[in-house]
Amino acid sequence: MKNLSVFVAIFCLASLLGCRDGEDLPSTDFSITFKATYGGETLEKNKDYTFGNYPIFFEGCRMYISDIRLVNAEREVIISDVEYLDFTPENAVSATPSILFKNVPEGDYTSISIGYGVKPQLNARRPSNFPAGSPLSIEIDYWAGWKSYIFSVLDGKADPDNNGTKNLSFSYHCGSDAVYKVFEFNVPIKVKAGQFTTADIAFDMKEFLTNDDGSLYDMVANPATSNDAANVVVAQALTAHWGRATSITQ
């Protein structure tokens, strides 16, 4: 009788987990197009924008996101463990990468959850642990000294003196487990088997550089993140803005 009770408990747990990840449901392909913007306009490399009352341009904009989940009252479906997004590749002024997620269970999802950076379980590893082509095999965005991936990069120049010379270089390279942050966005996402489903996610760098009270981030006082692994104050402050800087539509 005791063995029967254990079997029933295991069966119920397995059934619950199956419902949670949606493996028992019809599925379809789901594509997300990602875009970096500035004030709602597609961000382009080396193009002048206005930051407050002075000009600014961007030289590099790329980021990791991980543990992407579709959520409703019945289940949470992990559609990706990690993705790498380069919005300013070497051979183009801008890019809007589209990623296809296969076999996504159908459902009326009420929110999407995104981890900004590389989640700790994966961040504990290093590029040599992954095969070529994996988002985590990229050496350029890994700090060996910190034992961490660089979660997001935003580089550029600005002219806070408005004298015609962009003499302020800014470099925001955010990383380490202490900086990783998850946001959940209450946006309806409908996925129906047999129908190709799409969504768009935009990351606005103007909002990323804006404080919660509406004031602009003090780029003159804090033009860069620290090289000291113990000092993540700037990185944490900026990463906290991703929730407001992200917009999702379907």
For each of these PLM feature ranges, what is it?
Residues 20-250:
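A short, solvent-exposed, low-complexity linear motif enriched for acidic/polar residues
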Residues 15-18:
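C-terminal motif of bacterial Sec signal peptides marking the signal peptidase cleavage site
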